């Protein structure tokens, strides 16, 4: 790779330096700060004068405030031109400056009343609410002038706090008691003293007080009985006694209980004290010190449950004589009183209540309303004291909910302290007005104006503000003023966030106006529309056409477009050459002089342009080319770049961009040129490879044909053979021999006179036993002449003596790139393209309906299939197989028939090639050639043309692939024969499915890419080697028995973790820290090594980004990754791009179902030895050996090569070859064919439940209509007994086998199980009791795949989660619980540790009694929750699980993505930890912090010998991980913009600009690639890049 260093000298300027800073902070602005930004107050709602069209003074577009509308000219015209720069006009007050200041200058509005900022008030969690401990609903009542808030404690004359406590909100109904108490003239005087003493404070009463209060009730009743009076009068008498003793009587309420207590004034105990002490048992006494007065309180309690009725009666007396207290013990009336007892609650007062209270209390009740009240309360908060209090409360509290609330509050308080801001600034007193050019007013034709919505919203605010000032001066009624204040609050709300209001402000046509929040958030918001993606100058757009004559580094640009794009360069050159003025040069351009075209040729010669095709899904969506001027108006594109751009020539458009600066041109040429983009960044395989016509041409050129002119000729040299072809003596495809390429003399000739028999020219063996083709064709010679050659003229990649299909061409290009480098590959590609097109034209290949050969055997095969199916239907009717088995077997039969017909059809077509040529006949079958060469169409499509259309997919319901996902009636016809009406109707299902998927899933794939980019954009290669000793172990990847990916494919391009040694030969294959090349990977396979340790980004210890050693080779270049490579974005694009491609690919096959056919037997193909592991077996009555273990493994060791093959043997399989047995393959002496030997077989469609003992069957909880359903199969008509889901928790269907010795064995029956035996049947060991259907008819389709990928990347809990074992051990099934759940115990025999798990009723168990399980292994069916793997096995295992699961989805589609891309995303998902013990750190328990920060702090605390914090890894989904990014600019530009900015502002967050998005947003070079010349990360998170150092110089 080329390393580029730029040294740029910048001109010094006196303006603000937008580069020389290293962080951005956002915080809440103070009113003074807003005023310092402002250039004047906006006082009027006017915009521009309707006659002069000039801005109005003091209006929203005022020139005096915001600057002049014309450059260097004041409003009145007194001062014009630049010479008056900086002068302020004495007439109009406008400064003479440039008009662009109208984009920068703010104004402000002085609000007549404070107004709450909607973000801090309503964006959950409400910051104002958190600080004041208030509910958002209560806050809104105050802010929107519905209720008053009490600003100070209300004291009575004795200094005791009254009901009204500071911060309480008071409302009407609740305070009638005040009304009655004060305004009722009868009781006003009489009970004045009592009223003065009413107190309501929370006092914890002892539980033993019931006795005393019970006696108070007895006292009242006793007095009534002895005196023969009513209880009302008795209560009145007690009150009079209290009055005489001048003792205050107090009452305290709670929702369900009432406590009476007596407050005795020490100065006058009086008579009542004596009565009480005689009659009552004293329960407790409390002393309160208040204003140097000691008050003793003695408590008497009334039993709460029994007192209601009596007290209701008594309450009338109390109400009558104590009008100020409404003692109504009614449940619906009491709850409001609860508020009075809590010191942190708020009681609302309505207007009427305030007046009544103030009549009685004068000014001692301080209340307020609106944002002003809230601002006052916020002003009183002392943040330091508040913080101490919160810490103290956190230590005391035991409630998790309370702790969470306190932590939220602490975060807010800490934020204000750190950012040195005040909470009251969240309430606005000064409103900034944004610059007028950011909310323009544009004149349209016909005297109309188009205006930004913000102007309307500002106008409403100014109007209401001015009106409020006016009515306040008029001394209007308070109701009117409050209403106007509310309207002002609503107007400001609408400006800040119109969308989140209940009734948004609308404009003309009921359109919701766009507020400031709307201009920031969403796709059309400031972040995503203007900061992350900008429109650029020097660009054009046109339709693309193919440019077959272009070289790979060229593109054709229309002359007219080039003239416009290169205008400044042409003008510069004209001025230089012709020595003319700028105006003359422009005139020459417009005229189109001949000189202009000559200059255009010159300036475009060495100036690359960038071509881009939308959607740009990966970095190959923008590539650089050298422009070639072409006639017409279309851009010409090199055909080999089509696959990278995903372009075709059916009307696609592309954009052209012109790099202006020398640096940009250099980067375009060195890094982005199409010749440098031959490999795909996703897989490292070539992407610029021949396709379609080019493949067809090369395939035709290199094919051979019997019976053509010149067959069997022998030539002395290549040139002689070509001359003969040109003289038409030899055909292009004739088999010939050429000296230097093939052997000349045939081994079968006896003498020189004999003629060679060309039909015997077959492949023969050379001396070293390798296979060679002992003939060639002129076409192959011509093809090989285009290949790169060595200096001595020999072929650099040896002679390619074979038919060149697409697969062969890709392999050739790949090999050329790896062995000969980029330059020779580029030349090779252009040559392949040239001859491909040439010979595709000469071949004149086209499609003919006669070439669609329908196999003659088709009818017979279909007939046989139908016979087999009718046999299966009969078996199903007899109940021998289940409905599910019937369906699966039918699908299997049709799948096999379709494949067989397709094979026969292809063989028929292939035979045409081997027939001798006769003039007037076709040489080859064009359709076969297209499909076989890979130029157009697939086997599947050709099968549908001439074979049989096959099975179709239904519109999908189950993602897993359930029964009925494939329509079981296939389309037997093909397109050549034509479909019947029914078949056509069935096929429309599939066709529509494809189209619907395309539309819906493209958006989903695009969104996935966006989330991936957001989570990984800051992962950049920042150092050479992080020095870690950790890594991951990878080997051959298997899915069941099938090898998915071999070890050599997986480890190429990685760094070895340790030395890798061939133990047999004691050779060092790979050194520690060395890159693994393809050759070294081959040596690994030869040495039989199945697993090695490699460095991985998952274990990389780089603080920011990753290191080059852990990343390894860059797939896009095939070389070690360079410093500054943006590997995170590369990873996101590599995963997201195929997602979109796959989505678009479903409909090309027209919905024909391609099905995964399940393996159901294991055959030995070569001699070898059989070994089993974890095997437990039993013999059935037929003498067959049945497998009883769930995780049995068969290892087949072939000899003499000692190659091991591993197969999973499922429960219920029948074994034919036993452990340790040797297998020898016999060869049929007549046919010479090997006969494979069957080792084991099983039913792939259902899992049996097998009896392990002889005994009698008993059904438990198997009840007809409850847990058992007799289903009549719709197709077979046979009755099946199926276990169904049941509502009763207590039933758990199971089969119990009673052994002859009386002991019993239980077998749980999951839902959908089909019973095979009947109750009370006698069974033998090995007999099948029941069958569980297996849903295996999955169709290969990304529809199920994309949601699965998203689910894994989001770390979501799957819908049906499997129960996972947390320890290694042996399984014991304890049996069903009361609710029908199955209890599974896992016991470790070594440690004796035991764990129990409950498997929900109806879930399938995947383990059986006595099975051995490993930790993290599933006990029940369902998807494994990645969070469980993390908890049980740790980060490494969850990483491996996620990478493999995601890869599985893509592999099913045949998409190749390098593991390291997925690893990078998974690394980001695990880049946070949760604190479990804060130790001596500043962290709080439960807090989520970045792993890097945590490790730094941990080391620092350990270094100081402190107690280090403890944390555990957590898995965050990509969306959560993006939003928890350290950078608020990055997070805000992703999602939830307003919430992120609110949070950032309150906590005064600092963005250190480490990632890519934040630097793009503020317009700096990104810290990646050439923008990362020198990175220095110090402990303070400071971050310096080259450009900043330049700026500082």
Swiss-Prot record:
DNA-dependent RNA polymerase catalyzes the transcription of DNA into RNA using the four ribonucleoside triphosphates as substrates. Zn(2+) 1 binds at residues 74, 76, 89, 92. It is an enzyme of class 2 (transferase). This is DNA-directed RNA polymerase subunit beta'. It comes from Endomicrobium trichonymphae. Its EC number is 2.7.7.6. InterPro entries: DNA-dir_RpoC_beta_prime, DNA-dir_RpoC_beta_prime_bact, RNA_pol_asu, RNA_pol_N, RNA_pol_Rpb1_1, RNA_pol_Rpb1_3, RNA_pol_Rpb1_3_sf, RNA_pol_Rpb1_4. It holds the Pfam family RNA_pol_Rpb1_3. Zn(2+) 2 binds at residues 1026, 1100, 1107, 1110. Its cofactor is Mg(2+); Zn(2+). Keywords: DNA-directed RNA polymerase, Magnesium, Metal-binding, Nucleotidyltransferase, Transcription, Transferase, Zinc. One of its GO terms (biological process) is DNA-templated transcription. Mg(2+) binds at residues 648, 650, 652. The RNAP catalytic core consists of 2 alpha, 1 beta, 1 beta' and 1 omega subunit. When a sigma factor is associated with the core the holoenzyme is formed, which can initiate transcription. It comes from the Bacteria. Binds 1 Mg(2+) ion per subunit. Belongs to the RNA polymerase beta' chain family. PANTHER family: DNA-DIRECTED RNA POLYMERASE, DNA-DIRECTED RNA POLYMERASE SUBUNIT BETA. GO terms for cellular component: DNA-directed RNA polymerase complex. SMART domains: RPOLA_N. It catalyses: RNA(n) + a ribonucleoside 5'-triphosphate = RNA(n+1) + diphosphate. GO terms for molecular function: DNA binding; DNA-directed RNA polymerase activity; magnesium ion binding; zinc ion binding.
């Amino acid at each position: 790779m080329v390393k580029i260093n730029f040294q740029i000298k910048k001109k010094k300027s006196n303006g603000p330096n937008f580069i020389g800073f290293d962080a951005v902070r956002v915080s809440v602005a103070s009113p003074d700060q807003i005023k310092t930004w402002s250039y004047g107050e906006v006082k009027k709602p006017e915009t521009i004068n309707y006659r002069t069209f000039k801005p109005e003074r003091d209006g929203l577009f005022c020139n005096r405030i915001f600057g002049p509308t014309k450059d260097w000219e004041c409003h009145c015209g007194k001062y014009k031109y630049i010479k008056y720069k900086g002068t302020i006009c004495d007439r109009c007050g406008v400064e003479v400056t440039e008009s662009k200041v109208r984009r920068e200058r703010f104004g402000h509005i002085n609000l007549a009343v404070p107004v709450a900022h909607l973000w801090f008030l309503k964006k959950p969690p409400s910051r104002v609410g958190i600080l004041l401990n208030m509910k958002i609903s209560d806050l809104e009542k105050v802010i929107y002038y519905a209720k008053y808030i009490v600003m100070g404690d209300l004291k009575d004359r004795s200094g005791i706090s009254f009901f009204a406590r500071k911060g309480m909100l008071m409302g009407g109904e609740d305070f009638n008691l005040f009304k009655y108490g004060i305004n009722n003239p009868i009781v006003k005087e009489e009970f004045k003293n009592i009223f003065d003493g009413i107190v309501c404070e929370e006092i914890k009463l002892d539980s033993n007080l019931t006795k005393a209060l019970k006696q108070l009730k007895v006292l009242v009743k006793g007095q009534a009985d002895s005196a023969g009076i009513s209880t009302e009068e008795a209560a009145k008498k007690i009150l009079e006694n209290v009055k005489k003793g001048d003792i205050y009587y107090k009452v305290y309420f709670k929702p369900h209980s009432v406590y009476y207590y007596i407050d005795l004034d020490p100065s006058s105990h009086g008579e009542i004290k004596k009565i009480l002490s005689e009659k009552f048992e004293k329960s407790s006494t409390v002393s309160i010190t208040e204003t140097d007065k000691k008050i003793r309180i003695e408590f008497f309690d009334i039993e709460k449950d029994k007192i209601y009725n009596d007290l209701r009666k008594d309450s009338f007396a109390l109400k009558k004589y104590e009008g100020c207290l409404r003692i109504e013990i009614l449940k619906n009336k009491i709850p409001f009183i609860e508020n009075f007892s809590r010191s942190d609650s708020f009681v609302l007062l309505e207007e009427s209540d305030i007046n009544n209270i103030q009549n009685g209390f004068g000014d001692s009740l301080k209340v307020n309303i609106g944002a002003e009240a809230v601002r006052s309360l916020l002003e009183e908060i002392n943040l330091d004291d508040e913080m101490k209090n919160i810490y103290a409360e956190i230590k005391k509290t035991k409630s998790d909910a309370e702790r969470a609330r306190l932590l939220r509050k602490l975060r807010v308080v800490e934020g204000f302290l750190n950012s040195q801001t005040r909470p009251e600034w969240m309430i606005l007193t000064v409103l900034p007005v944004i610059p007028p050019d950011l909310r323009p007013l544009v004149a349209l034709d016909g005297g109309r104006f188009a205006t930004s919505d913000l102007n309307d919203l500002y106008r409403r605010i100014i109007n209401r503000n001015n009106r409020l000032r006016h009515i306040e001066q008029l001394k209007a009624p308070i109701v009117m003023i409050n209403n106007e204040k509310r309207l002002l609050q609503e107007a400001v709300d609408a400006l800040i966030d119109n969308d989140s209001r209940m009734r948004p402000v609308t404009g003309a046509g009921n359109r919701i106006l766009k507020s400031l929040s709307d201009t920031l958030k969403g796709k059309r918001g400031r972040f995503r529309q203007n900061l992350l993606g900008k429109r650029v100058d020097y660009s054009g757009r046109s339709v693309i056409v193919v440019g077959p004559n272009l070289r790979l580094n060229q593109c054709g640009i229309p002359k007219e477009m080039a003239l416009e794009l290169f205008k400044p360069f042409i003008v510069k050159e004209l001025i230089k050459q012709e020595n003319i003025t700028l105006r003359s040069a422009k005139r020459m351009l417009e005229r189109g002089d001949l000189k202009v075209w000559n200059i255009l040729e010159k300036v475009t010669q060495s100036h690359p342009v960038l071509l881009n095709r939308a959607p740009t899904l990966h970095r190959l969506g923008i590539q650089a080319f050298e422009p070639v001027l072409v006639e017409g108006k279309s851009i010409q594109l090199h055909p080999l770049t089509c696959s990278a751009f995903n372009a075709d020539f059916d009307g696609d458009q592309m954009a052209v961009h012109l790099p202006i600066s020398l640096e940009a041109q250099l980067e375009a040429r060195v890094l982005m040129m199409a010749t440098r983009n031959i490999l795909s960044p996703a897989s490292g395989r070539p992407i610029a490879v021949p396709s379609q016509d080019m493949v067809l041409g090369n395939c035709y050129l290199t094919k051979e044909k019997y019976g053509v002119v010149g067959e069997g000729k022998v030539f002395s040299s290549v040139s002689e053979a070509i001359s003969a072809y040109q003289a038409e003596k030899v055909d292009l495809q004739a088999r010939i021999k050429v000296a230097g390429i093939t052997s000349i003399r045939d081994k079968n000739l006896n003498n020189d006179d004999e003629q060679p028999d060309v039909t015997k020219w077959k492949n023969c063996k050379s001396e070293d036993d390798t296979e060679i083709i002992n003939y060639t064709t002129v076409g192959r010679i011509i093809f090989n002449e285009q290949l790169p050659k060595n200096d001595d003229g020999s072929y650099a990649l040896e002679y390619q003596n074979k038919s060149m299909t697409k697969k062969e061409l890709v392999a050739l290009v790949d090999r050329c790139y790896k062995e000969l480098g980029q330059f020779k590959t580029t030349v090779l590609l252009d040559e392949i393209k040239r001859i491909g097109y040439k010979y595709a034209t000469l071949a004149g290949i086209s499609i003919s309906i006669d070439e669609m050969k329908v196999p003659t055997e088709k009818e017979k095969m279909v007939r046989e299939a139908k016979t087999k199916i009718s046999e299966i239907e009969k078996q199903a009717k007899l109940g021998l197989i289940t409905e599910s088995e019937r369906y699966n077997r039918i699908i299997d039969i049709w799948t096999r028939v379709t494949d067989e017909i397709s094979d026969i059809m292809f063989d028929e077509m292939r035979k045409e090639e081997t027939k001798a040529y006769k003039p007037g006949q076709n040489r080859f079958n064009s359709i076969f050639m297209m499909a076989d060469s890979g130029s157009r169409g697939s086997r599947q499509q050709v099968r549908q043309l001439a074979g049989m259309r096959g099975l179709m997919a239904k519109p999908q319901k189950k993602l897993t692939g359930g029964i009925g996902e494939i329509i079981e009636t296939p389309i037997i016809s093909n397109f050549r024969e034509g479909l019947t009406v029914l078949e056509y109707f069935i096929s429309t299902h599939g066709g529509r499915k494809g189209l619907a998927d395309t539309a819906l899933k493209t958006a989903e794939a695009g969104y996935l890419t966006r989330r991936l980019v957001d989570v990984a954009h800051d992962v950049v290669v920042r150092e050479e080697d992080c020095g870690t000793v950790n890594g991951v172990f990878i080997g051959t990847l298997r899915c069941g028995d099938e090898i998915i990916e071999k070890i050599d494919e997986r480890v190429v391009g990685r760094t070895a973790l340790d030395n890798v040694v061939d133990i047999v030969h004691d050779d060092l294959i790979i050194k520690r820290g060395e890159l693994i090349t393809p050759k070294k990977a081959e040596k690994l396979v030869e040495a039989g090594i199945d697993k090695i340790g490699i460095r991985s980004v998952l274990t990389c210890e780089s603080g920011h980004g990753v290191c080059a050693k852990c990343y390894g080779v860059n797939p896009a270049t095939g070389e070690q990754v360079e410093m500054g490579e943006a590997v995170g974005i590369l990873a996101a694009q590599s995963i997201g791009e195929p997602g979109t491609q796959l989505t678009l690919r479903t409909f090309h096959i027209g919905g024909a179902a391609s099905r995964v056919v399940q393996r159901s037997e294991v055959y030995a193909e070569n001699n070898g030895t059989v070994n089993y592991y974890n095997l437990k077996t039993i013999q059935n009555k037929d003498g067959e050996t049945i497998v009883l273990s769930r995780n049995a493994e068969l290892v087949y060791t072939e000899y003499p090569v000692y190659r091991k093959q591993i197969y999973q043997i499922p429960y219920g399989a029948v074994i034919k070859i036993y452990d340790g047995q040797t297998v020898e393959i016999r060869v049929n002496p007549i046919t010479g064919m090997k006969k494979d030997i069957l080792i084991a077989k099983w039913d792939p469609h259902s899992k049996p439940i097998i009896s392990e003992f002889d005994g009698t069957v008993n059904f438990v909880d198997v009840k007809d209509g409850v847990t058992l359903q007799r289903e009549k199969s719709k197709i077979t008509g046979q009755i099946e007994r199926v276990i169904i889901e049941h509502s009763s928790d207590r039933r758990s269907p199971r089969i119990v086998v009673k052994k002859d010795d009386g002991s019993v064995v239980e077998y749980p029956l999951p839902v959908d199980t089909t019973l095979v035996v009947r109750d009370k049947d006698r069974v033998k060991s090995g007999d099948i009791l029941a069958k569980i259907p297996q849903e295996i008819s999955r169709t290969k389709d990304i529809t199920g795949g994309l949601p699965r990928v998203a689910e894994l990347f989001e770390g979501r809990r799957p819908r049906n989660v499997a129960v996972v074992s947390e320890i290694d051990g042996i399984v014991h099934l304890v049996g069903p619980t009361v609710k029908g759940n199955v209890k599974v115990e896992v016991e470790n025999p070594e440690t004796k540790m035991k764990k129990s798990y409950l498997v929900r009723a109806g879930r399938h168990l995947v383990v059986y009694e006595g099975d051995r399980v490993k930790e993290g292994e599933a006990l029940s069916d369902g998807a494994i929750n990645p969070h469980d793997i993390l908890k049980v096995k740790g980060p490494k295992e969850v990483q491996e699980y996620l990478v493999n699961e995601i890869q599985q989805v893509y592999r099913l589609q045949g998409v190749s993505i390098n593991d390291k891309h997925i690893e990078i995303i998974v690394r980001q998902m695990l880049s946070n930890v949760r604190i479990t013990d804060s130790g001596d750190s500043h962290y709080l328990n439960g807090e989520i912090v970045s792993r890097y920060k945590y490790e730094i702090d941990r080391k620092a605390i350990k270094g100081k010998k402190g107690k280090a914090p403890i944390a555990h890894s957590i898995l965050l989904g990509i969306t959560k991980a993006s939003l928890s990014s350290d950078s608020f600019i990055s997070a805000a530009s992703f999602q939830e913009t307003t919430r992120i900015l609110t949070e950032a502002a309150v906590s005064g967050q600092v963005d250190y600009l480490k990632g890519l998005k934040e630097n793009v947003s503020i317009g700096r070079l990104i810290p990646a690639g050439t923008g990362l010349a020198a990175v220095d990360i110090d402990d303070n998170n400071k971050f310096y890049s080259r450009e900043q150092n330049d700026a500082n110089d």
